Amino acid sequence: MDNKQLLLFRTRPWECLSVRTALRRSTSLAITGAEDRILLADKSGDVYSFSISHPNSPGQLQLGHLSMLLAVAVSPDDRYIITADRDEKIRVSSLEHPYIIEAYCLGHHEFVSQLSIPPNHPQLLVSGSGDGTIRLWEYEKGSELHCLDLSELQPSRCEKNRCAVMRLAYCRGRDLFAVLCDSPSSVYVLELDVEAERLLHQQTIMVKQRAWDVTFDDCGGLWLLDGDRAVLYQQHEGRWQEIPDHPDQTKINEVIHSNWPVFEGLPSVISCRNLYKMNIDNMAEYRMKKEQRIDQRQKKRTSEFAAESRDSKRPRMGAVKM
């Protein structure tokens, strides 16, 4: 999406149906439940709708934010479009009439980078942010049900490194979420407890290199793109364990290595570090300038006092009578 192109593929048989141009660099996309539209969010804060049944038609503007959009999701019944931006806001709008805002989900303290609506529980929304939290919402009401701070799951509490959520993957069969964080690079496996309306930490998987994507397959296996290799994890006796030399893993890694020039620059592109806003401490700047003014006054007074002392020590010339 960096080259402002939207490519539409048919998977069976595999073929490219269309290549369309977006006005701005895209940040996220979602496909409607009816599979008739692609909703594309971009850096300027707009969402455009692209038809799937008419693969060559241009995009139509759906809605806009005042800030950069980072994530977009659609409710399974296609009633709502949910958008998240760099200014910590999650907006719930009507899909057919986007100017009608149903609710806001407010609570994050940094940019909102990921959104996910579990298909098994369409009334719920899970969001991830640069503040290192995963939050569970009843989005139609804009009410927060639970907040899980990922930094508390790290022994070092992430100290100077911020836990920015990069990816959020859902496993439909088990009500599990896999959360990939930017720094430190790790994957948190969370269980959705619908009755308790909570997200429960199940396991933390430490990444060997620098991971940049995560997903579940149809069999419940957890795939992690770790550096230049795909790694498969499967659950055994309640623990996620790496499965080495899996046949599918070998095939995927062969494709990655044969096309590595295409993938090589992507990990740096998808980093969340440039999304944090600069924190300008006006009080600290005021105090620094005040101290500079006081120091200048003291130096001026010292120099004036020294000049007066020199003048007082000089002998005075009296008048001489002839």
Which residue stretches match the model-derived regions?
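Short C-terminal beta-strands that terminate individual repeats in beta-propeller domains
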Residues: 17-21, 59-64, 101-107, 144-150, ...
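Terminal intrinsically disordered, low-complexity extensions flanking WD-repeat/beta-propeller proteins
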Residues: 144-322
